[in-house]
Amino acid sequence: MEKHIFRQKSAPIHKKAVFSYFKCGEIANFAKTNHHILGMQRSDFEIMAPVGSWESLTAAWQGGADAIYFGIENLNMRSRSSVNFTLDDLHTIAVWCQEHNMKSYLTVNTIIYEEDIEYMHSIVNAAKEAKVTAIIASDMATILYARSIDVEVHISTQVNVSNSEAMRYYAQWA
């Protein structure tokens, strides 16, 4: 049985609801064609798909995703999956997404230890140079560095923001 996620983020500071899906097309097509039933405009949400290979990237686009999120190499929570992108793939992914009118979100959502800081800087710098839409981060070192070089940051679910006080705190980097 495949897992599906269909969730609207309702925190007041969010201007867009985010729908994420794991089975290409089904929920994406439902959301795109039936959003009025949910009392929403199409611009109120974004359909995101996790990708870890060129095949899944193409499937996300064919399935109607507005955006993809992906990790590269070691500093993301999906790094132990059997297929993963490399730093050399980053620019090509970003360009492909731009050409196909998709947003690209790079996950840098692991704990950053002291020995990881230089490597994290190189990944965030490469994301900026490649014009990735934003990074998804959980560690304060990543969040602060990305903001210091004007890279848009989205707070990862790894941060476990579960109340309005935490939301207000992290909103300063939104």
Regions found by a protein language model. Name each.
Residues 30, 35-48:
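Generic start-of-chain signal for non-secretory N-termini
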Residues 46-67:
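N-terminal basic/disordered segments at the start of proteins
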